[in-house]
Regions:
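Hydrophobic alpha-helical transmembrane segments
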Residues: 1, 20-35, 65-73, 113-119, 196-198, 217, 239-240, 357-358, ...
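N-terminal "leader" segments that precede or initiate the main folded domain
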Residues: 1-108, 193-197, 203, 219-259, ...
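Membrane-embedded catalytic interface detector for glycan/lipid assembly enzymes
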Residues: 12-21, 97-234, 245-263
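Hydrophobic, aromatic-rich transmembrane alpha-helices
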Residues: 30-39, 173-186, 358-373
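Membrane-interface helix-loop-helix junctions at transmembrane boundaries of multi-pass membrane enzymes
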Residues: 42-47, 180-196, 372-384
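Small-residue-enriched transmembrane helix-hairpin modules in multi-pass membrane proteins
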Residues: 151-161, 249-366
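Hydrophobic alpha-helical segments
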Residues: 336-433, 438, 443
Length: 444
């Protein structure tokens, strides 16, 4: 942490002197060092504090490079908020580790998880069916499928029916559940394995037809993170293969969304106009979110005291339709087309620097207990909880995950699957003849 604070101070001074490239590189180096520190201690590739350190601090370093004309020197309050966001998380995690230690139960024994095979398989069927049926209803009611629409710019933005669309995008959980199923089942039933592969294909087809790059990446990343959480490692060749397969799909969806190179370069306003799009697009999807936070800090007239962060409550209960004023707050961004923001945007919107610090401390506390939990997990669906939080921390530079109703819907759906699998597995653990009969009646 001392090294980080030194690097942070150096980056701040370099930014004030206008030496942007060095300001960014210092923070990127600090992010790598922080990740390596936790990885060497734990051997966990997706250790939650390590992941957050690498991507939050590293993302800030990328933003400090100031490669776009949309970038500007940050205010002192912005620098304080970014420091509080990381310092609160890291400090609370460190405090809890010193008070309680990071041990958390016995190592995983695969034979203990075999009783979860059948409920896991049925969970995949239910979610896949719900997603496909919901997609079909939306397509029928709205009268179009985004992939096949040419004369409707940004068709993906209009392809949703309130409430129902949550079930449509729930398909992103299926690949991760199939990873759990494959590792638990261990190839004992080839027909079910083939069926699981078909369900994976269907669950990936939905975001492709919706031309949603985000949902596609989310589905694949959750599956990869779940595999790493369960196996503790992954071969580099597998990761390279996944990336190679994802690139053409990403390009296809970008074209289908009507985002050609000329359009994107016009929005990004890069200082070097000849910079290739495969560099400028990921750069802007990281860097501009920090710039948007700075816009919020400099332009926000007053705080909203929790209303922004409670948006999932207003959305999932339908209150936003009854009281529109609950969600009628402007978005402060560098450009209207670039609306993605960091994880801490709404925390500052609600309570300023204090909100950012409290929120980061809470995330650090939750992450500590999740890391402890994953070491002694007995229900394999617990790995999906861990993977979701790991992914949200990895993409902490990208959006306000916990102010997003879809995030809570995914967590609730995962909780439902957890309980379903827990109840479905109990018959093999000696919970009595009546419960075994109940299980047989439900699962066959």
């Amino acid at each position: 942490m001392i090294v980080y604070l030194i690097c942070y101070a150096a980056s701040f001074l370099l930014e004030r002197l206008g030496i942007y490239w060095l300001s960014g590189l210092v923070l990127i180096g600090a992010a790598i060092a922080l990740y390596v520190y936790d990885y060497r201690r734990t051997g966990n590739l997706i250790h939650l504090r390590a992941v957050f350190s690498l991507f939050w601090v590293g993302g800030q370093g990328v933003a400090c490079l100031k490669l776009s004309n949309l970038s500007s020197p940050w205010s002192g309050m912005t620098w304080l908020c970014f420091l509080a966001a990381f310092g609160g998380f890291w400090g609370v995690y460190e405090l809890m580790e010193r008070l309680q230690g990071e041990s958390g139960g016995q190592s995983l024994r695969w034979f203990r998880l075999q009783s979860y095979e059948r409920p896991l398989f049925f969970s995949m069927i239910i979610i896949t069916a719900a997603s496909v049926v919901s997609f079909a209803i939306e397509a029928a009611v709205l009268g179009f499928i985004p992939m096949f629409v040419e004369d409707m710019p940004h068709a993906y933005s209009y392809f949703h029916i309130s409430g129902l669309h949550y079930f449509t995008v729930s398909c992103v959980l299926v690949p991760a559940l199939s990873v759990i199923y494959f590792l638990v089942e261990r190839g004992r039933n080839e027909r079910k394995l083939a069926a699981a592969v078909v369900m994976d294909g269907g669950s990936l087809l939905v975001p492709i037809l919706c031309v949603s790059r985000f949902q596609l990446i989310l589905a694949v990343a959750l599956a990869v993170f779940t595999f790493i959480a369960m196996e503790k490692k992954i071969k580099p060749g597998i990761l390279i293969g996944i990336v190679v397969c994802m690139i053409p799909l990403y390009v296809l969806l970008t074209v289908a969304r009507g985002h050609d190179v000329e359009y994107l370069n016009g929005i990004f306003e890069m200082k070097n106009r000849s910079m290739p799009i495969f560099i400028t697009q990921p750069y802007m999807y990281i860097a501009n979110n920090y710039e948007n936070f700075n816009c919020l800090v400099e332009q926000l007239p007053s705080h909203t005291f929790g209303l922004r962060s409670l948006f999932p409550l207003w959305a999932l209960t339908g209150l936003k339709f009854i009281f529109p004023s609950l969600v009628s707050f402007p978005l402060y961004v560098t450009k209207t087309e670039l609306t993605t923001v960091t994880l801490f945007y709404d925390a500052f919107y609600d309570f300023g620097l204090f909100g950012v610090l409290v929120f980061s401390c809470l995330l650090g506390l939750i992450s500590f207990y999740l890391v402890r939990m994953i070491k002694g997990v007995h229900n394999p669906v617990g790995y999906l909880f861990y993977s979701q939080v790991a992914l949200y921390l990895m993409l902490s530079f990208f959006t306000t995950w916990f102010s997003n109703p879809a995030t809570w819907f995914y967590l609730a759906a995962t909780g439902a699957v957890y309980l379903f699998c827990e109840l479905g597995s109990r018959g093999t653990h000696g919970y009595g003849r009546r419960r075994r009969r109940w299980k047989k009646r439900i699962f066959g």
